[in-house]
């Protein structure tokens, strides 16, 4: 992240103020203040980690993935008890994305659920949509299979199994 000395001074002052306003995180803000003041470029890269960008297409893909899970959950609810017993109920839970490798996706899902109020039925679990393993490729395969289903919101037990194993 390229910053002028004036920008570094402003950011340093902001970190100083934050350390005073939030004593519980003062050590974190003092560390960041030191990094900015001294210009440690390797560590300054971590300041940039939260300033990502998701394109409109990437946002729509995430919404499509979440909508697919919504459709699978609703379809499961419409199955009779015998069919429902054949569906692995754990696989119906939307796990989210891997915070280590798919951080922007995790943050977008959290934004959609927490700020926008979408998909309130999704269980945040203990990890708040951090699957702790890369999921995007798996979701893309599942999405392809789901899109090929003739009735995407009235899936049968067999179609659910096909989507799970995509």
Curated annotation (Swiss-Prot):
SUPFAM superfamilies per UniProt: YfbU-like
Domain of life per record: Bacteria
A Pfam family: YfbU
Family, similarity comment: Belongs to the UPF0304 family.
HAMAP family recorded: UPF0304 (MF_00762)
Entry protein name: UPF0304 protein VP0990
Source taxonomy: Bacteria, Pseudomonadati, Pseudomonadota, Gammaproteobacteria, Vibrionales
């Amino acid at each position: 992240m390229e910053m002028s000395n004036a920008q570094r001074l402003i950011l340093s002052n902001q970190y100083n103020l934050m350390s005073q306003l939030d004593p519980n995180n003062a050590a974190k803000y003092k560390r960041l203040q030191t990094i900015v003041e001294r210009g440690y470029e390797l560590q300054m890269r971590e300041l940039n980690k939260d300033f990502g960008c998701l394109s409109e297409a990437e946002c729509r893909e995430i919404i499509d993935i979440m909508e697919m899970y919504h459709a699978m959950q609703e379809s499961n609810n419409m199955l009779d008890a015998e069919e429902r017993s054949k569906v692995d109920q754990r696989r119906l839970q939307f796990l989210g994305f891997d915070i280590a490798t798919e951080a922007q996706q995790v943050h977008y899902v959290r934004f959609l659920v927490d700020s926008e109020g979408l998909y309130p039925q999704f269980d945040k679990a203990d990890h708040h949509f951090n699957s702790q393993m890369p999921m995007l490729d798996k979701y893309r395969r599942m999405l392809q299979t789901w899109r090929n289903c003739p009735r995407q919101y009235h899936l049968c037990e067999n179609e659910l199994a096909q989507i799970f194993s995509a």
